[in-house]
Amino acid sequence: MYDLIIIGGGPAAAAGAVYAARKQLKSLLVTAEFGGQSTVSETIYNWIGTPEISGRQLGEDLKKHVMYYKGPFLDVVEGEKVVSVVKNDKGVTIKTEGGKEFSSLSLLVASGSGRRKLEAINADVYENKGITYCASCDGPLFSGMDVIVIGGGNAGFESAAQLLAYCKSVTLINRSETFRADAITVEKVKAHPNMKIIINAVTLRVDGEQFVNSLTYKDTNTGEEHKIEAGGIFVETGQIPNTGFLKDVIPLDEIGKIIVDPTNQATPIPGIWAAGDATNGKYHQNNIACGDAVKALEDIYIWLHKNK
């Protein structure tokens, strides 16, 4: 029986594991992989203490830091996805996709979120046939082509910036007039001569033959439909929390985020905390996720000493 199980491999989970080990709590971290969502980012400029770092390097650094503490107080199971959590009088029991079971007195969920799929006619047909969800992974395959980015957040504009380095042109489609991305990023990308931005647009359908060759969108102001020819479509329309395995265990909000007390990251269920993008916190960033986990660990430490 562990004192604490941590689910996840991103910044929140890594921070939780480091703090748990340093507090000498008998802990287990279970993750399918290390790094979180940022592993697909070409360059991260706001990871405090490092002016710039690639997403892949960040993932490697997180793993290295966690593994430094692997030993008497920290076990790590990598390559396993948690599929169920059962709460009982003694604590919690988790089960992985590979059939492994582990039990603990307390639980920190830092399972993050996944990419939202494009909702448009034929989007499923052309996934991996021109529709992709990772510019840094697949972008070079579209060198010299006209491409489209869907989404007006930081991820959308960062993807556009990457693609402008080798694509013929980039058209960014945004659902509204305003962008969720940082203003400095928006202005930098907009200034590129091969960049075009379309606002108030909803994607209706994707067409092609063997691969994508066009996208049709509707102007939400006029109702008119327009077609854009493109060889690739990069989707950056937000995230869906990875919390499906928790729906019968702890309260989730309308989109599946874990409801927490922001003062200590505790859920309404005693003995279970959550941190990072899987929670209903107002803001989500790598640095915030780490802070969430540290708050949670401080509270978990006190709770365990009261309830052991």
Regions found by a protein language model. Give the residues of each.
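Residue-level detector of alpha-helix initiation sites
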Residues: G10-A12, S113-R115, N154-A155, T279-N280
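FAD-site-proximal beta/loop scaffold in flavoenzymes
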Residues: G114, V125-L141, T237-H284, I288, ...
